[in-house]
Structure formats: structure tokens, C-alpha cells
Amino acid sequence: MRKRKVAIIGSGNIGTDLMIKILRHGQHLEMAVMVGIDPQSDGLARARRMGVATTHEGVGGLMQMAEFADIDFVFDATSAGAHIKNDAALREAKPGIRVIDLTPAAIGPYCVPVVNLAANLHQGNVNMVTCGGQATIPMVAAVSRVAKVHYAEIVASIASQSAGPGTRANIDEFTETTSQAIEKVGGAGKGKAIIVLNPAEPPLMMRDTVYVLSELASQEAIAASIAEMAAAVQAYVPGYRLKQQVQFEVIPEDKPVNLPGIGCFSGLKTAVYLEVEGAAHYLPAYAGNLDIMTSAALATAEQMAGAMHSAAGATA
């Protein structure tokens, strides 16, 4: 079976971690080119040491390389603004190329593998939302498949040391993109996202808190749905886990809570507490926020490549 060759744009924390994952665990994918803009970056140096072709001339440099002719997938781990330009350039040069967007640009549909990958297997560009989105949206979706969700709020706390310049430059885009994906993918009527960069030393693991306000429903059914969803995420992010039991609170009709911009709410409040430990392929285990992004992106591209192989076999 022919593996699909991939290029990664962005030689920072996320791009380098993703490269190592593909080299170690790629089933349908083969690492071909690492693209950066800083010739002194550690990511490009590491790629060269691992036998991967590199360029420090950005997307323009990639498209001038002989390897570009065989590239089927491109992962973009740059920034939201850069991705818009990168996608346009790539698509003009190679209209059928598959682009996995790890920035908050969201040109293509949001993709959270355990929730909606099957519906997006044939998209030319998919957006991996954000680290907070990949961790928390499955939990919102787990509740929404049991009861109608009116409001969901997530708080993602990540170690400051794990946030590179790209993450820091995209804080506003992080909150906007995650909030929208909570609604579009998670199924919430209204979504809100908050990110906290925790400067604690030694660095703490990624922690996520998910609050969901829904119609009254069986607490046992919701807890079971959440446990099932957590296990599905663990299939590609082994360090993903529920930190404690799911907490429930019934909000009675005669004592509703007032949500600014939404109105009064009564029903069921569900609180989910998560911890994400990284696989430590490139950065330490506390950087679960990077690990869940790269793991989700790899799972997405692997399934896309598998679908392409199956389709090619069917038409052969």
C-alpha cells in the first residue's frame, strides 16, 4: 500500500511534535518535507537530523521543491493569518491537495475526530479548532446526544511554557474559534471559551473544565455518554482522562439562573473536569495541549488517507 506523502508548514512546537508522530506512527502517511521561515529553528534542524527534507523559505520554497509533486497532504501549524495565504497558494498550485489546518483560521469546516470526522473525510481543507476545542467539544457533544444543550462554557488552562509565539499571537482567535465550534460541532445553542496560560513552576498539565446547561435528562445516561466519549478520545490521545466524577446540579424552574445575553435558564447543569497528559514526543508531558492537537490532526489525516486508499482500490 502506497503511503501518502505529507509536508508540515511551521517548524515550531506543534509542527515538530507532529513530524515526530508521523515518523513514528504513520500508517497511511509518510513524512516528506518540513517547512519553516527561520533557518536556525530547532524544528528544521531536528527534521534534517531525522532525514526529512526541509526549506526555510515558507510555502514558496515548498512549491519549488521537487518533493512537492508527490505531496498529498499539508499540515499548517503557522498562524491564522498565514494559513489563509498558504491555503490559497497551495490550492492554486495543486487544487486537489488536502490541507489540515492547525491554526484558528477555520477556512474549512471544524473537525473533531470523535464527533464529526466521518462527515468531513472528503473535504479539501479541515480545521482542527484549537487545543481547548479538541479536549472539550467531545464532552459537550456527549451531553448533546442525550439532551438539548442550551449553553456550554469551557475553560482551558495550559502551562505557559507550552504556549509558543503562534499560540500567544492567536489568543483572540482561540476564544472565537473554540466558541463557534462548541456550537457547530458540540451542538450547544450558545458557546463560550476561556483560555488561561498558567505560569506555575514546575509547569502543570493541561486542565479543562466544561460546564453544560441542558434540558433535564437522565444523569446516568449523560455520565455514560461522557465516559464512552472519553474512551473514544483516548484511542488517539492516551493521556486524555476525566479528572473526577461528572458533577450534576438540577436548577429548578422557580430558581433559574440568569445568563447574560441568553436569559433565564432552568434544567440540568453538568460539570466535567479533564486532564490531558502529553505523549512527550517533543515537549514534556505537561504540554497536553499540543499533544491533543497533533494527535487529532494525525488521526484525521490517517483516516482521510485510508479513505483515499479504499476509494482507489474500489476503482482499480
Curated annotation (Swiss-Prot):
Pfam families: AcetDehyd-dimer (PF09290), Semialdhyde_dh (PF01118)
Alphabetized SUPFAM superfamilies for the sequence: Glyceraldehyde-3-phosphate dehydrogenase-like, C-terminal domain, NAD(P)-binding Rossmann-fold domains
Ligand binding (NAD(+)): 11-14, 162-170, 289
Pathway assigned to this chain's UniProt record: Aromatic compound metabolism; 3-phenylpropanoate degradation
Superkingdom per UniProt: Bacteria
Active site residues of this protein: 131
Entry-linked SMART domains: Semialdhyde_dh (SM00859)
One Gene Ontology biological process: 3-phenylpropionate catabolic process
EC number(s) on file: 1.2.1.10
Swiss-Prot/TrEMBL keywords: Aromatic hydrocarbons catabolism, NAD, Oxidoreductase
GO MF annotations, alphabetized: acetaldehyde dehydrogenase (acetylating) activity; NAD binding
CDD domains registered for this protein in UniProt: ALDH_C
Substrates-to-products reaction catalysed: acetaldehyde + NAD(+) + CoA = acetyl-CoA + NADH + H(+)
Matches recorded under InterPro entries: Acetaldehyde_dehydrogenase, Acetylaldehyde_DH_C, NAD(P)-bd_dom_sf, Semialdehyde_DH_NAD-bd
NCBIfam families from the UniProt entry: ac_ald_DH_ac, PRK08300.1
Assembly description: Interacts with MhpE.
Family in the record: Belongs to the acetaldehyde dehydrogenase family.
Function: Catalyzes the conversion of acetaldehyde to acetyl-CoA, using NAD(+) and coenzyme A. Is the final enzyme in the meta-cleavage pathway for the degradation of aromatic compounds.
Protein name as catalogued: Acetaldehyde dehydrogenase
Lineage: Bacteria, Pseudomonadati, Pseudomonadota, Gammaproteobacteria, Enterobacterales
